[in-house]
Amino acid sequence: MRERITFIQKQGDSIEPTTLKIKGGVLNGPEIQAAREDRLTIAIDELPKDLQALLGTAHELHIRYVSSQPYEAITPLLARLPPGFHLFYTPAGQADATSPALCLALNQIFGNVQCENPEKSFTTLPRDRFSHSAAYQFYQPSVDLSPFIALVKEKLCSSSKDQSCAARADRLANASSLDISYDAISHAVKLTATWPYQKQEVHATSRPQTRTEVGVLNSDRPGHLEPHELGISGLLTVLGQDKKPSATMFAFASRHRDAESSFSAEFLEPTGLHPTLKLRLESSKPPIEDAYCSPHAYFTLPKTIFADRHQLSDDLFLASKNLTGLRYISQPVDLEAPEYVEKRWGSSLLLELSPPEHEESKSWTVQVPLHLRYLSPAEGGYTDIQVPYPAVFWACAAEEGTKFPNNPFEKANLGYDGLFGPRTVFWHVEPRPTIGSRLSNMIKVPVLDTNKAEWVSGGTGLAVLLGFAWIMWKLFGVLSKSGYQNQPSQAAEVVKAKKNQ
């Protein structure tokens, strides 16, 4: 088992090495302004037998939880996803795709995860484009981390002598993101949690049979840095091995960068059953000038709302909304089915945006047409649904021959990264809430009022009965006047005339 705790400051921040005290496998330091990332790497044979059996059904499994609270991301922790619970999965065999084992385990670990099995509830990803895409995708707008935190306390903290283990597990409730990744090649599970840029107390404790590495780092820009690289400098120490921190400086290629811009999202009023989501971007200026760049928005829409790919195929319509084109949408998307009969989680789509020309420093807007599904009846006649913010980024092509090997902070299997080539660099635009403090928008959807459902069903039945009675009365009136077959049909008259000739 290996543990890595990293405090990351902005460029220009610094900490005096003498303020870090190491004693008996414990590191203490001052309170600093920094982001924090904790990563725990566990070999599969160190896990409980039931989890080993579950992971044996997966070739790869990536769970990504993103908080709906806005947070400031700093270099190199820049990769973003829409807020919510994301899962990317490749089964070990075809039979595992139809097994309910994964969904049952997700419900035990995270509570109410609405899935039956991957084949029914997940959507498929286009693996024919780039090899690093998983086979299936699942998404849910919200999930409760309390069951997972309780599981961590039970499995990791119950046998640990570290008094801070339970407290660290409780801090997961305030994490900006939580990632759990497994692949059959490494035979290891990586749990990674990040907290946003804020005041953090520098403190770390080593655990028995665990190699604990602690870093206090900040972004740096040495003169030899390549355009596609990020520089990092700071202090590193291995608890229980080093007596004092060691200075370090290194650089690595990264596909995720900061566009140093922001956007917001809100629905135009009135929303109706065909709401339009308006994105307002702070700047239309590309993040770099010496490469081809295009802005994109990646959506994960729950099954209560969807986009119509036919509508998004009209070039003139797209141009009127400042959209260039629909680059991807998951399939199938039933345009008529109500929400309560849909088995799949929803749909994901990638839209290329069309920034205005010759206005590089001004804000601009994009309109995305969406459609609501019919929802289940509810008391009061309305149901509130949450629509998460998309992930907005500029996709820029790196120079020919540029390679992006794995780096210590890299994130892959994000859903949209598999839709681009391996030399694409993502310059992320920071989301900012328009109203409130959540990166989602609420829509009040009209539904059948359960308090009036009896009147509606009774009235419908009465209307059908009256309509049937009226039709029968009219038929009876016609028959009573003319009788049945009293008048010969036109065909019979023709036959009779021919016989008489």
From Swiss-Prot:
Cell compartments where the protein resides: Endoplasmic reticulum membrane
Major localization listed first in the record, in broad terms: endoplasmic reticulum
GO CC terms, sorted: endoplasmic reticulum membrane; glycosylphosphatidylinositol-mannosyltransferase I complex
Keyword Glycoprotein set for record: yes
Domain of life: Eukaryota
Pfam family, one: PIG-X
SMART domains membership: PIG-X
Recorded metabolic or biological pathway in which this protein acts: Glycolipid biosynthesis; glycosylphosphatidylinositol-anchor biosynthesis
Carbohydrate-modified residues: 174, 322
Cytoplasmic topological domain residue ranges: 480-501
Keywords: Endoplasmic reticulum, Glycoprotein, GPI-anchor biosynthesis, Membrane, Transmembrane, Transmembrane helix
An annotated GO BP: GPI anchor biosynthetic process
Membrane topology, Lumenal segments: 1-458
Membrane topology: Single-pass type III membrane protein
Transmembrane intervals: 459-479
Family in the record: Belongs to the PIGX family.
Database matches in PANTHER family: PROTEIN PBN1 (PTHR28533:SF1)
Role noted for this protein: Required for proper folding and/or the stability of a subset of proteins in the endoplasmic reticulum. Component of glycosylphosphatidylinositol-mannosyltransferase 1 which transfers the first of the 4 mannoses in the GPI-anchor precursors during GPI-anchor biosynthesis. Probably acts by stabilizing the mannosyltransferase gim-1/gpi14.
Name under which the protein is recorded: Protein pbn1
Organism encoding this protein: Neurospora crassa (strain ATCC 24698 / 74-OR23-1A / CBS 708.71 / DSM 1257 / FGSC 987)
Gene: pbn1
